[in-house]
Amino acid sequence: MLKTGGLSPSLCLLSLLLALHSAERSYPPPQRRFEYKLSFKGPRLAVPGAGIPFWSHHGDAIPGLEEVRLVPSMKNRSGAVWSEISVSFPSWEVEMQMRVTGPGRRGALGVAMWYTKDRDQVGSVVEGLASWDGIGIYFDSSSNDVQNGPAIRVLASDGHDLQEQFGDGTVRELGSCLRDFRNRPHPFRARITYWRQRLRVSLSGGLTPNDPEEVCVDVEPLLLAPGGFFGVSAATSTLADDHDVLSFLTFSLRDPGSEEALQPFTEKEQFHLARKLEELKARLALGTREDTILPLNSKAQEEGERFFNLEDTLSRQSQILQALQALSRQMDQAEKQWKQQLGSVVQIRPEGGWNTAKVSTLLYGQRTLIQALQEMREAAAQMASGAQVFYLPVGTKHHFFELDQTLGLLQKDLRDLVKMTAKPPRPSGWLPGFSTCLRTSIFLFFLLIQTVGFFCYMNFRQELDKRLQEYLFTESISLQPALPIPRTIGVLRRQPVSPSMQA
């Protein structure tokens, strides 16, 4: 009997690993296709007054033209954005750029990127989940351990778990790594790739614009069914940071060379398409502009695109220019009136001569006022020139509100100047700083007369009282001549003293 020797287990394991590695390297890179309905980026990230196309924002999220501020630097706030269209392809890749800035070494709760079965299930709270089905990549900046944070964690749930807290060592954490993404000089980039039931999270440091990417988490096998929704959320606690998302780009992945099979049209669809083709040919033959523009407009409405009304913007700018020109003319008139008044005051010169200090004060005040008017004119001219080239998008009412306030202030200042110039002319002998009140010498003269009269009256009153006392005393003596002296003295002691006698 012949015996054959088998391979050792170590050689079998090594050959298996080499086969897997060669098979993995033999796979060509997937073919990417940009999905614009699941993406957003600047510079026209949000439509003024309409939000982000194909996305919805919730909580304290603020869509802008360059970025989406999920949460401002305020305490106990939360916000999120969610895609309105579900993911219809099995494999995908997301490139996200974000910026988290704030004071101190510890940050707020952080940012989370979601792929869940139901949108708005997670909401805008990142520190706890209720019931959700999908995955979440959590950029945690609230770690108490500064040396071991911030951290990036990959979480998963099947929709049957109760509320769990991040960062406490739960079994739902598929992987994590430590990477500081706060207060970077450049936006922090994250690439999340799901391809062949494998989830890979790659990160760039944000120290330079072109930092190389490093793999943070690589999980397989992981089954994610299509039909989910993308979302990004953030929240703050007692510590506050600015959480901004600059771009969120989604790509669908498929094997290279594998094109989607075109299904044959049915007879009903062929008949419908043929009729549409005939209608289009008829419209093109007529060459009417309305018929050719109508399909474009309907298509734009279906795609959710919005066009700006340029005529309305130009009409508003023309009204602003007219108002500024009218203000400039009124300022010219006010300046001319002030110059005329200044010339008339200089020409009038009294006989006694001017007070040099008062005249210089008046002239300095008028020169200051004329200079202020000139500055107002220059400001109005700058506003007019800026309004000719500045673009105001329709729907931003705050620009026009600021312009209305500015025009109102200019009109108020102009009305005050007109009222000052409309005062009646002063007499020719009027001096600057001269008061029309009573002179000091006249006041002192009348005060002296009043004092002299008062003292004369008091002297006359004292003389009258003295004569009256003498008269009463002589009459009392003539009526009682026989009274003895001691008795008379006793009677006088018992009688009350009159006020006139006291005087």
Swiss-Prot record:
One of its GO terms (biological process) is endoplasmic reticulum to Golgi vesicle-mediated transport. Residues 461-503 are cytoplasmic. The chain crosses the membrane at residues 440-460. CDD domains: lectin_ERGIC-53_ERGL. Residues 1-25 form the signal peptide. Its main location: endoplasmic reticulum. Disulfide bonds join 177-216. Predominantly expressed in the sublingual salivary gland, in the mucous cells of the acini, but not in the serous cells, nor in the duct system (at protein level). Not detected in the submandilar, nor the parotid glands. Expressed in the mucous glands, but not detected in the serous glands (at protein level). Besides the salivary glands, expressed in the Brunner's glands in the duodenum, but no other mucous or serous glands (at protein level). Residues 32-253 form the L-type lectin-like domain. Residues 26-439 are lumenal. It is found in: Endoplasmic reticulum-Golgi intermediate compartment membrane. One of its GO terms (cellular component) is endoplasmic reticulum membrane. Gene3D superfamilies: 2.60.120.200. It is a single-pass type I membrane protein. GO terms for molecular function: D-mannose binding. InterPro entries: ConA-like_dom_sf, Intracellular_Lectin-GPT, Lectin_leg. It holds the Pfam family Lectin_leg-like. Keywords: Disulfide bond, Lectin, Membrane, Signal, Transmembrane, Transmembrane helix. SUPFAM superfamilies: Concanavalin A-like lectins/glucanases. PANTHER family: PROTEIN ERGIC-53-LIKE, VESICULAR MANNOSE-BINDING LECTIN. This is Protein ERGIC-53-like. The gene is Lman1l.
